[in-house]
A protein has these predicted regions:
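Intrinsic-disorder/low-complexity, polar/charged segments
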Residues: 7-11, 33, 70, 201, ...
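Aromatic-enriched hydrophobic runs in primary sequence
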Residues: 2, 27, 60, 67, ...
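Acidic, serine/proline-rich low-complexity intrinsically disordered regions
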Residues: 140-361
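Helix-turn-helix/homeodomain-like alpha-helical modules used for DNA recognition
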Residues: 87, 92-149
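N-terminal, Lys/Arg-enriched amphipathic/low-complexity engagement segments
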Residues: 1-49, 99-119, 123
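Hydrophobic alpha-helical segments, chiefly the membrane-spanning helices
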Residues: 34-58, 63-89, 93
Length: 361
């Protein structure tokens, strides 16, 4: 057994060296730098930060480089590193209405206070390969706005609330759950639910959000507002007693205006779904908002008509790190388990043959 263990250890070390060589690629080409990944693969960095749970573009870019472009592996690396970090303080709630806007659109109001800002987007491209990029030419300078963007813009739901068309969601002052310290138990609070959706796999949530549009869940959404920009981060040191601005982070926020409900105890009103992610991960924010609203079905007395409305099904399977780990463990040796099933199968086949022979006699 000792020889087998040592042999396996050497094989694993060799496999790691091969993987490192594969990650590096052709040595005659310049190695891609972490700064290049951070600057030129920004959307990949945003996803890794969001699902990895750390706002650090350099670390996310490093994880992408180390993982050879495998974003799920990069998320795993960042999530593992996160567990080594101390918690120094808790910030104040983010005031996204004061976001320094880069992009802001609404599909429900053409004209809204603060205006619509397209910002950077792939929405109106023709999805044709740009072969000019092969020439690695200079990127044309981006146009500059004639006027500065407003420093603060009210949310669309705030406008709907003033017309009593939507309920205002007020902070009740209770401390939100923390899924990194207390494992969620289903059914869970909305704060725990939103935390799991933020860390959830984009593709999984996107598929569930799409399913709600195809009839697997009562959901008729409008993109009430999608905004991307920089939000100030504040904290209150105990020795000072007042808030200090310690920096800003880039966020994308999505609020979906969903089909109205007609409860017995209050006037009919629109419902909402909410998504908030690091960076410019707009598709993830939209998918998160769709699934958030679907998971509110029990609160509105709606039956479960699709998987997106099943809280435990969605939240227990959305984490790609956990899912990848469980699926990957199937690659580990299962010799004893397989031998047990093999022996059982042989015995059943023997019994079957004996019954066949007895029947023939």
């Amino acid at each position: 057994m000792y020889v087998a263990v040592k042999g396996g250890e050497k094989a694993i070390e060799a496999a790691h060296r091969l993987q490192e060589q594969l990650r590096r690629g052709d040595d005659s080409l310049p190695a891609i730098g972490v700064e290049q990944i951070e600057q030129q693969l920004g959307l990949a960095v945003d996803r890794v930060m969001t699902e990895g749970g750390i706002y650090d573009r350099e670390l996310a870019a490093l994880a992408i480089k180390q993982a050879g472009g495998d974003l799920v592996e990069a998320i795993f690396l960042l999530r593992a590193y996160r567990t080594t970090l101390p918690r120094l303080a808790v910030s104040e709630p983010l005031a996204t209405e004061n976001m320094r806007l880069e992009r802001r659109i609404s599909a429900v109001y053409k004209d809204l206070p603060g205006g619509q800002v397209l910002g950077p987007t792939y929405d109106y491209t023709h999805r044709l390969l740009d072969f000019a990029l092969l020439a690695e030419g200079e990127t044309p300078a981006a146009p500059q706005a004639d006027e500065p963007l407003p420093e603060s813009c009210a949310h669309v739901f705030e406008l709907l609330g003033k017309q009593q068309l939507a309920l205002a969601e007020q902070d009740d002052g209770s401390a939100p759950d923390d899924i990194t310290r207390t494992p969620p138990v289903y059914p869970c609070s909305r704060s725990a639910r939103l935390q799991q959706l933020v860390r959830g796999d984009e593709g999984f949530l996107l598929a569930l959000g799409y399913a709600t549009q195809r009839g697997y869940g009562r959901n008729h959404p409008f993109a009430g507002e999608i905004r991307t920009g920089y939000v100030s981060l504040e904290m209150v040191p105990e020795e000072l007693g007042f808030a200090l601005d310690i920096g800003e982070i880039l966020l994308t926020e999505c609020e979906m205006v969903n089909g109205f409900v007609d409860p017995q105890d209050r006037p009919p009103h629109f419902t909402r779904g909410y998504g908030l992610v690091f960076g410019r991960a707009e598709r993830k924010a939209m998918a998160m908002a769709l699934v958030d609203r679907a998971l509110q079905s029990p609160e509105y007395g709606e039956g479960v008509a699709g998987p997106a409305q099943d809280e435990e099904f969605v939240l227990a399977h959305a984490d790609n790190v956990e899912a990848a780990g469980f699926v990957s463990h199937l690659k580990l040796p299962h010799y004893v388990d397989f031998q047990a099933e093999l022996e059982l199968l042989k015995r059943l086949r023997q019994e079957f043959s004996e019954r066949q022979e007895a029947r023939d006699e």
